[in-house]
């Protein structure tokens, strides 16, 4: 299920655009996640009180967390599948502390794809979308395997 060198290049090319505004992209990804899947909001004590999109857009904490999420994901993507060291602490915290189900990782992957489609249509055509989808699936599968090792049935 690995990606070719060309596919990784497509992923990292569009990711360069994301890194120009990690916090802004991250905020949009989280807002889209919470709008499309309101049940995910319950996992975030800090954001549970944010009921409207305007409240979410005005939240510095949401923007900071979006930056954290996409910064971590970028570090993983740049490893081109060789992300064991980066993944282990992330899986540990998401399985044992935050109890984030794998399904929610699918939901945020969808939100990432949607935000990239809307913000970077010229750099995120069908090939880049396919490559990013594969990269995010690889990430999710590896997270799920780590969850299993940790005894978390998320």
Swiss-Prot record:
Residues carrying Phosphothreonine: 68
GO cellular component, one term: sarcoplasm
Keywords noted in UniProt: Cytoplasm, Heme, Iron, Metal-binding, Muscle protein, Oxidoreductase, Oxygen transport, Phosphoprotein, Transport
Molecular functions per Gene Ontology: heme binding; metal ion binding; nitrite reductase activity; oxygen binding; oxygen carrier activity; peroxidase activity
Residue numbers bearing the Phosphoserine modification: 4
Limits of the Globin domain: 2-148
Stretches of the chain forming a coiled coil according to its record: none
S-S pairs: none
Broad EC category: oxidoreductase
Subunit: Monomeric.
Protein purpose: Monomeric heme protein which primary function is to store oxygen and facilitate its diffusion within muscle tissues. Reversibly binds oxygen through a pentacoordinated heme iron and enables its timely and efficient release as needed during periods of heightened demand. Depending on the oxidative conditions of tissues and cells, and in addition to its ability to bind oxygen, it also has a nitrite reductase activity whereby it regulates the production of bioactive nitric oxide.
Protein name (Swiss-Prot/TrEMBL): Myoglobin
């Amino acid at each position: 299920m690995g990606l070719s060198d060309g596919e990784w290049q497509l992923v990292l090319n569009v990711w360069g655009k994301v890194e120009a505004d990690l916090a802004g992209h991250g905020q949009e990804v989280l807002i889209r996640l919470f709008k499309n899947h309101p049940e995910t909001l319950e996992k975030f004590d800090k954001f549970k009180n944010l009921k409207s999109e305007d409240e979410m857009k005005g939240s510095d904490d949401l923007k900071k967390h979006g930056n954290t999420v996409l910064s971590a994901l970028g570090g993983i993507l740049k490893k081109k599948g060789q992300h064991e060291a980066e993944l282990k602490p992330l899986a540990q915290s998401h399985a044992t502390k935050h109890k984030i189900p794998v399904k929610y990782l699918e939901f945020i992957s969808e939100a990432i794809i949607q935000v990239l489609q809307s913000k970077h249509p010229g750099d995120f055509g069908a090939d880049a979308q396919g490559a990013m989808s594969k990269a995010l699936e690889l990430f999710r599968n590896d997270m799920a395997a780590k969850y299993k090792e940790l005894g978390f049935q998320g």
